[in-house]
Amino acid sequence: TTVTENVTSLAGVPSWFLVLLKHILKETGKNDIHEIWPNLELFIHGGINFTPYREQYRSICSKGLNFMETYNASEGFFAIQTDPMDSGLQLMLDYGVFYEFVPLSEMGTPFPKSYSIAEVDMHTDYAMVITTNGGLWRYMIGDTVRFTSLNPHKVIITGRTKHYINAFGEELMEHNADAAIAS
C-alpha cells in the first residue's frame, strides 16, 4: 500500500487531501505524516484558497512542507507558483490561452473595458477573460485576480466575480475574508 512507499510529494485540492491525510493518520495510529513518509517535502495544491488550511497542514507535518500553488480550472491551466517565498502565480502565456482583464469596477456596466496583459497594473482587481485554442471565445471564468508583478506577470487570486460584499462601497473581497478567518 501507499503508506509503505517512499512518498516525497503530494498534489491535490487542499480540502480533500486533508481528509485523506487525517484518515491515513487515523488508520496508522500516527500523529504526524512524517512518521509515515519521512521524506515528504512538497505539497502542490490548487482549486481552492489554501490559506484556511495552511495551519492544519502544518499541525500534522512536523518537519514542514513546501507548499506550491497552481491555478487551473476546467477551462485551462493558467499559472504556477515559481517561488515558495512568493505567493504570486506566474501566468503561463504560452499554453494556448489569450488573456483579457476587466477591472472589477467595470463589472455590470453596459460596455466593460477589457485590458490586455500589456495594459494591466498591480493595484486593480480584475475579472479574467480567456480565449483558448480549445474553442472558448472571450469566456469569463468567474475568478478575480490582482497582479503582484508585471515582469514576469504574476497574479494572486482575489476571489470570484460574484463573491464579494459591497453593501456600502467597501468591496470586501473573498481573499480578505478568508485571511481574517484564518488569523
Regions found by a protein language model. Name each.
Residues 1-183:
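Active-site glycine/GP-rich loop and adjacent strand/helix microenvironment
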